[in-house]
């Protein structure tokens, strides 16, 4: 590969880069190098500075200090247009598409005429295993398909430096492997790839080099084969880290509106022959205290089903019963008042008020429950409680949530759902964009909530996560439930086979 040629200068050379926001140092004298044909993994906890560093490289932010070189040439006053011209393309964690333009128009947007090659676009789609309709609007795509469109935009621009920020967060294992195949082909062509991920097994599978950021500095850097998983996790996690969560007592959760603490065999949520946009004839039930996994490939109908249960989409037919009473005729706010709470897949467009404060966001579902007036002091007290237990990093209490890192935004969204006192909690990709140090806390938190007899529907594209968390899993394929597995039956390989419709095992007895 090209990076074996020592005469070739680095594609990217960052020296002494520093950056601060509102007096807070977010980058401290960063050194980072990317060679041609190199896949360099970048890891770090939420708020470690990864996204800020990548925005500087992509020309979105300007450094306060330091030197940036592209292919051996010093570059200053970099902006996104100039970055694209230099072959730098950033694929963000949250897709930034034009919702009213078609998929094809988004891919080709602002592409120089000599690079507009529709046959190449179709070939790349085939290599990625994508079944995207190029003529539908981007607003109709789910998060995973939006991410694939962003990846296509970068590939169509013949980028020399490709930055991928959590590209597999909403992809299934099969889709992830197809992406990795394409990235390896780009690597052979001399493209340098910066790969940001919280999934350490992916890093060992794909990358040759690794750098770990912590508190705005580089804590570890070198060839990945020289480091163990434990060494990488230790570099990510500060030495003086918080103690593990100690049940809901430490959270101080008030689940008075939730079901009785006495375990019950009677389902709290029953769905019968439910059909809607993207799914049909869905029947299942979930009991208090049960974690019911919902797995399937992108486009299987999981998110559409969740949004229909919550009332965001209309049901075509079938019945939804919460606490033995039909909620078909209830609006979303009424279902919420009955204890049905939904944590959406796309936190920025559906879950959070980006210009509002952190405390206001956490309490936003309950502001009108007990009083007409908003109570800033109460919001602040709630914020402080969750920040201590979920290790949410922020500068000040009135800070807009849009200024937080992606992982910290996700933690605020989880806190918002918990503050609504759920009886049934539907969580769609709960650890998307959350670092390895925080995932275990979130897993533990979800289990503690289930132990208080809250029913949880757990939707995730990370099948290892589903196997780890779920008591039972329903596997969807093309809008239908293609299989059900008990805890003893489930493993990643079995779920994948069912998700792709290869076989349909005997249904479990309890449904």
Curated annotation (Swiss-Prot):
<keyword id="KW-0997">Cell inner membrane</keyword>
<dbReference type="InterPro" id="IPR050107">
    <property type="entry name" value="ABC_carbohydrate_import_ATPase"/>
</dbReference>
<keyword id="KW-0547">Nucleotide-binding</keyword>
<dbReference type="InterPro" id="IPR027417">
    <property type="entry name" value="P-loop_NTPase"/>
</dbReference>
<dbReference type="InterPro" id="IPR017871">
    <property type="entry name" value="ABC_transporter-like_CS"/>
</dbReference>
<dbReference type="GO" id="GO:0005886">
    <property type="term" value="C:plasma membrane"/>
</dbReference>
<keyword id="KW-0813">Transport</keyword>
<feature type="domain" description="ABC transporter 1">
    <location>
        <begin position="12"/>
        <end position="240"/>
    </location>
</feature>
<keyword id="KW-1003">Cell membrane</keyword>
<feature type="binding site">
    <location>
        <begin position="44"/>
        <end position="51"/>
    </location>
    <ligand>
        <name>ATP</name>
    </ligand>
</feature>
<keyword id="KW-1278">Translocase</keyword>
<dbReference type="InterPro" id="IPR003439">
    <property type="entry name" value="ABC_transporter-like_ATP-bd"/>
</dbReference>
<protein>
    <recommendedName>
        <fullName>Autoinducer 2 import ATP-binding protein LsrA</fullName>
        <ecNumber>7.6.2.13</ecNumber>
    </recommendedName>
</protein>
<comment type="function">
    <text>Part of the ABC transporter complex LsrABCD involved in autoinducer 2 (AI-2) import. Responsible for energy coupling to the transport system.</text>
</comment>
<comment type="subunit">
    <text>The complex is composed of two ATP-binding proteins (LsrA), two transmembrane proteins (LsrC and LsrD) and a solute-binding protein (LsrB).</text>
</comment>
<keyword id="KW-0472">Membrane</keyword>
<feature type="domain" description="ABC transporter 2">
    <location>
        <begin position="263"/>
        <end position="503"/>
    </location>
</feature>
<keyword id="KW-0677">Repeat</keyword>
<keyword id="KW-0067">ATP-binding</keyword>
<dbReference type="Pfam" id="PF00005">
    <property type="entry name" value="ABC_tran"/>
</dbReference>
<dbReference type="GO" id="GO:0016887">
    <property type="term" value="F:ATP hydrolysis activity"/>
</dbReference>
<dbReference type="InterPro" id="IPR003593">
    <property type="entry name" value="AAA+_ATPase"/>
</dbReference>
<dbReference type="GO" id="GO:0005524">
    <property type="term" value="F:ATP binding"/>
</dbReference>
<comment type="similarity">
    <text>Belongs to the ABC transporter superfamily. AI-2 autoinducer porter (TC 3.A.1.2.8) family.</text>
</comment>
């Amino acid at each position: 590969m090209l990076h074996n040629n020592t005469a070739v200068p680095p594609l990217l050379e960052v020296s002494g880069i520093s950056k601060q926001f509102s007096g807070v140092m977010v980058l401290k004298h960063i050194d980072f190098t990317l060679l041609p044909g190199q896949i360099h993994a970048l890891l770090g906890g939420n708020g470690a500075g990864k996204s800020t560093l990548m925005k500087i490289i992509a020309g979105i932010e300007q450094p306060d200090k330091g030197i940036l070189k592209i292919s051996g040439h010093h570059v200053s006053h970099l902006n996104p247009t100039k970055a694209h011209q230099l072959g730098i393309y950033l694929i963000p964690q949250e897709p930034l598409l034009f919702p009213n333009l078609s998929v094809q128009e988004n891919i080709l947007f602002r592409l120089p005429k000599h690079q507009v090659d529709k046959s190449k676009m179709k070939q790349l789609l085939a290599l990625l295993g994508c079944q995207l309709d190029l003529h539908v609007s981007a607003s109709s795509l789910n998060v995973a398909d939006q991410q694939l469109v962003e990846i296509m935009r970068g590939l169509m621009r013949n980028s020399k430096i490709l930055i991928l920020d959590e590209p597999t967060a909403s992809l299934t294992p099969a889709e992830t492997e197809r992406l990795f195949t394409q990235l390896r082909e780009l690597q052979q062509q001399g493209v340098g790839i910066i790969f940001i991920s919280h999934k350490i097994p992916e890093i060992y599978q794909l990358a040759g080099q690794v750098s770990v950021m912590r508190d705005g500095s580089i804590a570890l850097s070198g060839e990945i084969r020289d480091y163990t998983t434990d060494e990488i996790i230790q570099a990510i996690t500060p030495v003086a880290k918080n103690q593990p969560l100690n049940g809901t007592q430490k959270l101080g959760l008030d689940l008075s509106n939730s079901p009785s603490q006495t375990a019950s065999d009677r389902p709290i949520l029953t769905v019968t022959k439910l059909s809607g946009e993207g799914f049909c004839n869905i029947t299942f039930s979930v009991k208090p205290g049960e974690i019911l996994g919902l797995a399937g490939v992108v486009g299987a109908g999981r998110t559409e089903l969740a949004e229909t249960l919550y009332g965001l989409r209309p049901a075509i037919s079938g019945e939804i019963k919460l606490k033995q009473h039909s909620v078909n005729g209830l609006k979303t706010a009424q279902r919420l008042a009955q204890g049905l709470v939904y944590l959406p897949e796309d936190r920025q467009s559906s879950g959070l008020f980006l210009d509002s404060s952190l405390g206001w966001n956490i309490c936003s579902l309950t502001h009108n429950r007990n009083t007409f007036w908003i109570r800033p002091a109460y919001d602040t007290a709630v914020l402080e409680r969750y920040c201590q237990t979920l290790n949410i990093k922020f500068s000040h209490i009135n800070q807009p949530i849009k200024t937080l890192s992606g992982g910290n935004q996700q933690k605020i969204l989880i806190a918002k759902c918990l503050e609504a006192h759920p009886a049934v909690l539907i969580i769609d990709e709960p650890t998307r964009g959350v670092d390895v140090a925080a995932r275990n806390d979130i897993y533990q938190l979800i289990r503690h909530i289930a132990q208080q007899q809250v029913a949880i529907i757990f939707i995730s594209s990370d099948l290892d996560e589903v196997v780890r968390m779920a008591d039972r899993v329903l596997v969807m394929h093309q809008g239908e439930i293609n299989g059900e597995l008990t805890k003893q039956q489930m493993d990643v390989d079995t779920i994948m086979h069912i998700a792709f419709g290869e076989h349909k095992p005997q249904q479990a007895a309890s449904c």
